[in-house]
Amino acid sequence: MTQFDPATLRYDVNGLIPCIAQQEGTGEVLMMAWMNADSVARTLESGRVTYWSRSRQAFWVKGETSGHVQELVDLRVDCDRDCLLAVVRQTGPACHTNRRVCFYTSVTSGEEVELMAPE
């Protein structure tokens, strides 16, 4: 085993890396958000998934205001080290639209189909 260092990840020109959140047990993809090296470190230290909000230019602890927290179970690095997978225990909906997942729209035969309503 090797000690993990967030600085070894491959960030984009803005110092960000995409992170996909996946529900523990089911494997359901919940959402994608951005992290920087500090939010990766905070996530690992606290066990609460912490993203970087590009619009607010601030840390975003998932569920801090909504109560829809993501408890980190496992953090995985892809083969190119330029994308993360956070396996989480999600409390409540993951999406800010109050849906279980952010990927609730399907494109089928050129048409958009909404797969789920808000909870």
Swiss-Prot record:
Location within or outside the cell: Cytoplasm
Pathway: Amino-acid biosynthesis; L-histidine biosynthesis; L-histidine from 5-phospho-alpha-D-ribose 1-diphosphate: step 3/9
Pfam families: PRA-CH
Residues that hold Zn(2+) according to the record: 79, 95, 102
Catalytic activity, reaction form: 1-(5-phospho-beta-D-ribosyl)-5'-AMP + H2O = 1-(5-phospho-beta-D-ribosyl)-5-[(5-phospho-beta-D-ribosylamino)methylideneamino]imidazole-4-carboxamide
UniProt: Mg(2+) binding residues: 78, 80, 82
Cofactor annotation remark: Binds 1 Mg(2+) ion per subunit.
Recorded GO CC terms: cytoplasm
EC number(s) reported in the record: 3.5.4.19
Amino-acid biosynthesis found in the keyword field: yes
Entry-linked InterPro entries: PRA-CH, PRib_AMP_CycHydrolase_dom, PRib_AMP_CycHydrolase_sf
SUPFAM superfamilies hit by this protein: HisI-like
The protein's role, per its UniProt record: Catalyzes the hydrolysis of the adenine ring of phosphoribosyl-AMP.
Family: Belongs to the PRA-CH family.
Quaternary state and interactors: Homodimer.
HAMAP family associated with the record: HisI
Name used for this protein in its record: Phosphoribosyl-AMP cyclohydrolase
